[in-house]
């Protein structure tokens, strides 16, 4: 996986937050301050992103399962698109408390989603009184919005990729409680102590998020091919 400083620069990965909003623990990853904005050291970003890509590729080769998390507006569509591309699960609308720490309860909601989808597909809902059908369709839309990305998740993920550590605090806490490794884009207001694999970068700009998540996804896809080939060899 080749990552150049030019492409990081072009995507605005170097722009951090206002200096007054910084987390001092991010100091090692900050290159300078310009007009009250912290500038992230892209040499470190390139190195750490390369290492993260190698790690996810190796994990995918071992058949590990990934969960992508990013519920902010700028990240939502990228998270869904890239997760689907590499066969990962995702949460891109709202993190329901307990998705990981109370997985067995959440699974009942997932089963409810599947049940309602089946009833919609088979025309069962059309046979119900209009008011009842409308209520069930509203429930279906809500469940889809929140849980569609983990509909086929049968167990807890092995690795979680997070965009915006500050926003996804509950997801971070649940991962840490369960000892699930976190890979996270860390802006200058984040805490590197709360992640296992840090990628210093702008977690607000769409182009920055897309570049980093796409690089990780490409590596997962590459690793998954190796896993599929190894498995077919043993069949």
Swiss-Prot record:
<dbReference type="GO" id="GO:0003735">
    <property type="term" value="F:structural constituent of ribosome"/>
</dbReference>
<comment type="similarity">
    <text>Belongs to the universal ribosomal protein uS2 family.</text>
</comment>
<dbReference type="Pfam" id="PF00318">
    <property type="entry name" value="Ribosomal_S2"/>
</dbReference>
<dbReference type="GO" id="GO:0009507">
    <property type="term" value="C:chloroplast"/>
</dbReference>
<dbReference type="GO" id="GO:0006412">
    <property type="term" value="P:translation"/>
</dbReference>
<keyword id="KW-0687">Ribonucleoprotein</keyword>
<keyword id="KW-0689">Ribosomal protein</keyword>
<dbReference type="InterPro" id="IPR001865">
    <property type="entry name" value="Ribosomal_uS2"/>
</dbReference>
<dbReference type="InterPro" id="IPR023591">
    <property type="entry name" value="Ribosomal_uS2_flav_dom_sf"/>
</dbReference>
<protein>
    <recommendedName>
        <fullName>Small ribosomal subunit protein uS2c</fullName>
    </recommendedName>
</protein>
<keyword id="KW-0934">Plastid</keyword>
<dbReference type="InterPro" id="IPR005706">
    <property type="entry name" value="Ribosomal_uS2_bac/mit/plastid"/>
</dbReference>
<keyword id="KW-0150">Chloroplast</keyword>
<dbReference type="InterPro" id="IPR018130">
    <property type="entry name" value="Ribosomal_uS2_CS"/>
</dbReference>
<dbReference type="GO" id="GO:0005763">
    <property type="term" value="C:mitochondrial small ribosomal subunit"/>
</dbReference>
